[in-house]
Amino acid sequence: MTKNKSVIKSGGSLLAECLSANRVKHIFVVPGESFLGALDAFVDRKDEIKLVNARHEAGASNMAEAYGKLTGKPGLAYVTRGPGACHASVGVHIAFQDSTPMILIVGDVSRNVRDREAFQEVDFKSFF
């Protein structure tokens, strides 16, 4: 008789696993405190997923948009909450206008402080 051993995975690990399973090869990123767990998981999969470090969120989203436009595969940008998401909206707008495949993932505040004006909190549903 075998025992089922539960394996607890972090959200970041699950995200990296799913992106890898969907053959994502590049993520254009401005590292941020709100998604350190995901960054750790991407580093663990550095042979599968290459993190391309941008110096500004608008640059990351524009790189993702250009990647999508040039390859036909969704370009993926990952930025932090608040100002990071606001800056990244430039590339999202271009992708929307040009019908370019692009995905923007934004780190966010913890659920327990959401809708309580937490540091750099933005209502993304309204914003985007």
Where are these regions (language model features)?
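N-terminal alpha/beta PP-like core and its mobile active-site loop of ThDP/TPP-dependent enzymes
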Residues: T2-F128
